[in-house]
């Protein structure tokens, strides 16, 4: 049953980072990666990543949903006996323009930066034993001004096997669970509640249109999902239909939607986030202050498609939930069909293109 305790509760969906996801490479990817990621064990489940620019060009790397992000985002994939361990952290939607300088790292050719993180905080490793860590994918880069996403570079790591002490790892994961459970609830009253309800109603309408567009097929399916066959059109339409049904129901379902951040995760670059393991979505302050309800500019961000983006992450909406494999139009259109079907921003951009008439 959906919780409605001083918050706006919205419908649930069935679904399952850019960083940390082991995915098939994009259709035009090269075997070599511009960024080399060297993973080593520091102590227990604490891992060090050294990220090196292997290319011949200066890069401005976005750290959100990547190494150096201080939020509990996915940085590596973890495998136990060949099966990926479920991710228990957060997935965020960040801005694609007007980014602050503190989330950008400049790397000249040959230069590196480091990041240390505890993989047991965001994955339940209480079973202990050997696990394998690895990561590859695409990370956004910004223009020379460092404020707007302008491209992507590929990154790839080594495989690192570590032996996990299950008892110690369980304590780290419990800290994340406690973080979720003790947070103070925020209300959905006043103008923020009104703005959120309007966005959710419009999200339902737009998702219905997007489902119809997907069923019909055509150039837009090829543009965003690189396929136009019956099976792909059905998968896309079914996810949009699930989002439409759930976002139109403000009093039932299993996903809880917060108008205000209950966990102090938001920053001036994050629009909203989802904790898939909790089927919980929260807007951030800039959802209201920096974005309109609908953006008519092609590939733009707005409240409606931000909520849609987050809904596709929720594991109770449409199974499996989407991940954050790529952000922004330029990156999303590079993805293979398999990756696009598993990428939240691809669905958001597909739907937004309908509103914008792209």
Curated annotation (Swiss-Prot):
Keyword Glycoprotein carried by entry: yes
**GO annotations under biological process?**
proteolysis
Quick one: where is this thing mainly located? secreted
Residues of this chain annotated as glycosylated in UniProt? 249
Q: Which cofactor does it need?
A: Zn(2+)
Q: Binding positions for Zn(2+)?
A: 309, 313, 324
Annotated EC = 3.4.24.39
**Gene Ontology cellular component terms for the protein in this record:** extracellular region
Q: How is the cofactor bound?
A: Binds 1 zinc ion per subunit.
- The protein's name in its UniProt record: Neutral protease 2 homolog PADG_00776
Q: Any idea what job this protein has?
A: Secreted metalloproteinase that allows assimilation of proteinaceous substrates. Shows high activities on basic nuclear substrates such as histone and protamine.
Quote the InterPro entries the UniProt record gives.
Fungal_M35_metalloproteases, Lys_MEP, MetalloPept_cat_dom_sf, Peptidase_M35
Q: Which residues form the signal peptide?
A: 1-19
């Amino acid at each position: 049953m959906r919780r409605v305790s001083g918050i706006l509760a919205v419908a649930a969906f069935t679904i399952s980072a850019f960083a940390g996801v082991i995915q098939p490479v994009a259709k035009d990817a090269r075997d070599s990666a511009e960024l080399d990621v060297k993973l080593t064990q520091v102590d227990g489940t604490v891992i060090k990543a050294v990220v090196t620019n292997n290319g011949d060009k200066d890069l401005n790397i976005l750290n959100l949903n990547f190494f150096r992000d201080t939020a509990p985002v996915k940085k590596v994939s973890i495998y136990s006996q060949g099966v990926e361990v479920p991710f228990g952290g957060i997935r965020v939607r960040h801005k694609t323009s007007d980014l602050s300088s503190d989330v950008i790292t400049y790397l000249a050719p040959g230069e590196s930066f480091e990041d240390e993180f505890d993989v047991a905080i965001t994955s339940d490793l209480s079973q202990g034993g050997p696990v394998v860590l690895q990561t590859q994918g695409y990370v956004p880069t910004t223009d020379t001004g460092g404020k707007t996403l302008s491209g992507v570079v590929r990154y790839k790591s080594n495989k690192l096997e570590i032996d996990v002490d299950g008892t110690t790892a369980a304590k780290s994961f419990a800290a994340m669970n406690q973080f979720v459970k003790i947070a103070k609830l925020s209300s959905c009253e006043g103008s923020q509640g009104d703005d959120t309800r309007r966005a959710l109603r419009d999200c339902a309408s737009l998702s219905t249109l997007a489902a119809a567009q997907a069923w019909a097929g055509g150039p837009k399916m090829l543009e965003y999902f690189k396929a136009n066959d019956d099976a792909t059109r059905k998968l896309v339409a079914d996810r949009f239909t699930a989002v439409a049904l759930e976002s139109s129901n403000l009093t039932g379902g299993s996903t809880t939607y917060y108008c205000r951040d209950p966990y102090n995760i938001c920053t001036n670059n994050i629009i909203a986030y989802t904790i898939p393991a909790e089927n919980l979505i929260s807007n951030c302050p800039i959802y209201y202050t920096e974005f309109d309800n609908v953006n008519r500019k092609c590939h733009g961000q707005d409240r409606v498609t931000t909520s849609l983006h987050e809904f596709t992450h929720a594991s109770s909406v449409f199974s499996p939930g989407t991940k954050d494999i790529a952000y922004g139009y330029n990156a999303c259109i590079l993805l293979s069909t398999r990756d696009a079907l598993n990428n939240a921003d691809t669905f958001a951009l597909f739907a937004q293109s309908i509103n914008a008439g792209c």
